[in-house]
């Protein structure tokens, strides 16, 4: 193999001797290429990479080392031919251009001034290719192995591209089951919130007046124009005046004498004052006095949700140290794919109850799980569950009493004349008589309690039950003035004592 670097180094100081050396180079060119055939290249000694000096850095792509030397030599010849061709086209340029060209390729000593030399070199290369015949040259390297590798890579990349498509198709299959059109009526049955109930919430309350504030909220929804009635709405102050209380109302401690039956009695007194009809009863109370025997949590939930869809029933929830009013609910599906489904089974949804808050120190609307409410109603002394702070879990109160629970759901219902049905009732007995002015905070008699027979009491609902009869006896024995100094038998601890 000719030493190209040696020729290049010797050619630099001897610029004047280019013409005599160019002719031997052309004569030996054909012999040099012949000497490096493929058979001889297989036995060629290839040194380490540090000892190789290839002037043109031939881009050899074949993996077999036996072609490295041949590729380097033939690449040099190929580059030399291209330089000779380019030099013949610019022979008419200025001498400065010739010097610049010679500086850029200073490691090749070729005669570029004569055009016939380039033609002779082209002819010698043509004769070289003809003499080699079918022997592969540097630019004729077999790349069949590379084509097979590229096809494999393409096939693998195609497989990789197809796999995510299959995954997306699998993920998209469940989405096809979702309904395309929203069934509005069915969704309305699962999400119920009558804004009139919220409008009627008496907020804020007086200190420890959550019981009477919740009762006023229910009454306004049932009978006032603010809700579903036709009477003007009443305020807490008007209701307290009807019940015999006098200002300042901030100084009244309602907690000791405000209980479940107390609220039911006050509801009837306000109805008698405004000459309207209604009834009240305990919807769900699993433990303690006046418990709803035989009522289950599922049945109570069904009645509660059905009543919240109507405008003839209002509710009060007695929880830990507080009263407030359920105003709506949402039945949330357990699966995201059923968010807009129509009718769902009860086991496929989870119920949340929206509760209006009369206290200004808490959010205006609570959203509590029905399961948490059931937990609260089913705990017994000394255990209790604060529904407004469910994160605290079960707690224990300091009391000697064991068993029982005052927490419950109370229902207040507006009655119409059609509710009495075809029973042979005299309208005179049902029409309230004029009431004398309230003096000395005396509780007026209710004609609905005294003039209706016991048989008719059994037909009018739960407000005329054994608990109702006990309430009558209690009303005859006590008045409001006497009860202000002593606690009610069903009174809880100070209602909203922290407000």
UniProtKB/Swiss-Prot annotation:
It comes from the Eukaryota. It is found in: Cytoplasm; Nucleus. The keyword Ion transport does not apply. The keyword Oxidoreductase does not apply. Residues 1-29, 153-172, 428-465 are annotated as: Disordered. Residues 444-453 have a biased composition (Basic and acidic residues). GO terms for cellular component: cytoplasm; nucleus. Residues 153-162 have a biased composition (Polar residues). Its main location: cytoplasm. Keywords: Cytoplasm, Nucleus. Belongs to the BIVM family. This is Basic immunoglobulin-like variable motif-containing protein. It comes from Xenopus tropicalis (Western clawed frog). The lineage of its organism: Eukaryota, Metazoa, Chordata, Craniata, Vertebrata. The gene is bivm.
